[in-house]
């Protein structure tokens, strides 16, 4: 597992670690200080994941700008 301030190798790794943190926090078994540390790491991972998603979206926009027939449309998740 990466060190506390180290960025995960990939988006998928960050997401997996974030899911693990959520599970531990939801269990309610962590002491307060550990829970705060886990929460802090979770916030870091969420921000890193959001940044990676924004970078991917920018790459898609660049690729689509080369193809004038294709236009990007907002993504709407089915589960919302």
Curated annotation (Swiss-Prot):
> What keywords is this UniProt entry annotated with?
Cytoplasm, Exonuclease, Hydrolase, Nuclease
Chief subcellular site? cytoplasm
> What SUPFAM superfamilies would the database entry show?
XseB-like (SSF116842)
User: Tell me, what's a Pfam family for it?
Assistant: Exonuc_VII_S
Its EC number is 3.1.11.6
Mind naming one GO cellular-component term on file for this protein? cytosol
Question: What's its catalytic activity?
Answer: Exonucleolytic cleavage in either 5'- to 3'- or 3'- to 5'-direction to yield nucleoside 5'-phosphates
Origin, by domain of life?
Bacteria
Task: Give the UniProt subcellular location, in the record's own words.
Answer: Cytoplasm
Provide the GO biological process annotations.
Answer: DNA catabolic process
GO function term, MF aspect, one: exodeoxyribonuclease VII activity
Q: What does this protein do?
A: Bidirectionally degrades single-stranded DNA into large acid-insoluble oligonucleotides, which are then degraded further into small acid-soluble oligonucleotides.
Q: By its UniProt entry, which NCBIfam families does this protein fall under?
A: PRK00977.1-1, PRK00977.1-4, xseB
- Subunit organization: Heterooligomer composed of large and small subunits.
Q: Which family does it belong to?
A: Belongs to the XseB family.
The name on file for this protein is: Exodeoxyribonuclease 7 small subunit
Provide the species name: Salmonella typhimurium (strain LT2 / SGSC1412 / ATCC 700720)
